[in-house]
Amino acid sequence: GQKLWGANPIIIQSGTEVYSWPAVVKSDNGQTILIHTVPNGIYQSRIRAHKLDVNGQLLWGTNGVMIQNNGQMASYQVPEVEPDGNNGALISWYDGRAGNNLSSSFVQHISSTGSLYFPADGSEGSLAAQRNKFYPQVAFNLATQETYLFWMETEPDQNQNGIFGQKFSPSGDRLWGNSGKVFIPLSAPN
């Protein structure tokens, strides 16, 4: 329990932004990747990543790396963050970037150097129309470098739900078709 960064905590902050919902994964050389949200209102959060060295110094600059920069994620949503087993991280979330009062699930894979493997603002799990895709969970197959994303899918009124999933290539291409796979079909909750 010895404090390795001194008696006082290291504060990562901005004079113009609020940071919330932090998550940390182990990276290379004793370093860590910090993922957090940057809320700018109730439905205007973004996601950012920082890398800290063993002394708590920011390695990717004060602004870090933007994971999701469209600002259409609810500020109360906590992104899912998992290590990739290769000193990087996987981040999943849902947002309403289409502007149609529906949310869709997205995933991003960031390397230990801060490079994004997937397109800017993440890869979308499903392009199925007139559906919400909430509460994504992410997993990574280190041997194949494939990413798996699973979510709860609902129709617009949210009276029915099911579990759907998608497999992504190392560069973020959908491998299970544009609508993903159905694991539990839509049905009314019991």
Model-derived features: positions:
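Extracellular, repeat-based ectodomains that mediate carbohydrate processing or recognition
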Residues: 1-190
